[in-house]
Amino acid sequence: MIFPAIDLQDGRSVRLYKGDFAKETIINPDPVDQASQYEAAGVGALHLVDLDGAKAGKPVNVDIVKRVRAAFTGVLEIGGGIRDKDAVDLYLEMGVNRVILGSVALKNPELTKQVIAEYGPERIVIGVDGKNGKVAAEGWLDQSDVPMTDLIGAMVAAGAKYFIVTDVDRDGTMQGANEDLLGSLQGQFPMARIVASGGVRHLEDIKNLEKRGVVDSIVGKALYEGTITLEEISAFNKENASC
């Protein structure tokens, strides 16, 4: 499945370059309107990131997420600033399908295990962001020495299924996904579902990832640059709806 991404900052839809909060491009001043366009196109899935929340360590763009949920009927996932159970509960009770835990999975694994046990692996997704195979946290502002494989292994053992793996150096660059990293992680953890994020340019990238067993991808800049279209995403997701 392909998830088009909407990144929220100061109430607007933006794109960052390599995760740099200072290097933003405004995509749409009204993210709800953008989500409505995705709904009309029938894409069936949407990836939201609360960038303000990632910096603040708590949900910030809650009202916008609520309005996006009302406008978009497909699978909706949200990440950014979800650091405690209250934040998890807030979004799931709002009707969001999946909540993404990134920093908290690294820094508070016990809480992460608790919410996986309570809500199940279809609703709790682990965000694994970083550079050179090591995990970054706190909106990518804090680069750790923890290998991605350690975090994924611990969370697989806790019952997690979905892992959104973002190569920070590829995000917003249109350089192509890090196929070697993603394919290697999927091969090491066949019971997990690795989701590609960062650098995806077009359907060919997505098909190459599929050959390595990575069947889910997130696209951002490629959509705004026109190298992949909403129509292509919609057709791809309908074709792969059984996955």
Task: Please give the residue ranges for each predicted region.
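Short, acidic/polar
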Residues: 27-39, 83-89, 144-154, 206
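Glycine-rich, proline-tolerant flexible connector loops at the mouths of alpha/beta enzymes
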Residues: 45-61, 108, 165-175
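Glycine-rich phosphate-binding active-site loops on the catalytic face of alpha/beta enzymes
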Residues: 90-111, 169, 198-202, 212-232
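Charged helix-capping and loop-helix junction motifs
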Residues: 59-66, 141-150, 175-184
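Glycine/small-residue-rich loop that forms an oxyanion/phosphate-binding "nest" at active or ligand-binding sites
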Residues: 52, 60-119
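Conserved anion-binding
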Residues: 11-14, 18-22, 92, 96-171
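Conserved, mostly hydrophobic/aromatic
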Residues: 7, 38, 46, 91, ...
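Catalytic cores of alpha/beta
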Residues: 72, 76-98, 180-216
